[in-house]
Design a protein with these regions (language model features):
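P-loop NTP-binding core
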Residues: 1-130, 137
Length: 138
């Protein structure tokens, strides 16, 4: 089966986005699917909700997007079998200046996911986005 990418996004806060992301990823993992959730929200609620301590987020999605780390090094285990996460930190809110000179910067994440064949080990990739309505809501 080819992997599926699911974006969980809404520009309004408080609509159940975190609950949906955590429950969907956990349910898929529970039936044996290999799941990667990428936390693209600087608040890091999906990361926290899946038990990733803030002190253990040295390689986050910020470092990946800013080309300071590769995607594979940022993937962390959760306490749930078959479920891994790339956590987020508040640093992600400052990613725009880092990408200002990048051509086609709106496609940065897509390039990373396709160029590195990073999703080959996963059946599903869930993109948990922020509430912000900006170019990098992914």
């Amino acid at each position: 089966m080819k992997n599926k990418i699911i974006a969980i996004s809404n520009q309004k806060g408080g609509v159940g986005k975190t609950t949906t992301a955590i429950n969907l990823s956990t349910a898929l993992a529970a039936i044996g699917e290999k799941v990667l959730i990428i936390d693209l929200d600087p608040q890091g609620n999906a990361s926290t909700g899946l038990g990733i301590d803030y002190q253990n987020r040295n390689n986050s999605i910020y470092e990946v997007l800013a080309s300071q780390s590769n995607l594979f090094d940022a993937i962390q285990n959760t306490e749930i079998e078959n479920l891994k996460i790339i956590p987020s930190t508040v640093d992600l809110s400052g990613i725009e200046p880092e990408l200002a000179e990048v051509n086609d910067r709106a496609f940065t994440l897509k390039k990373i996911l396709t160029d590195q064949n990073s999703l080959n080990d996963f059946s599903f990739c869930l993109l948990y986005t922020s509430d912000a309505a900006d170019e990098h809501s992914w």
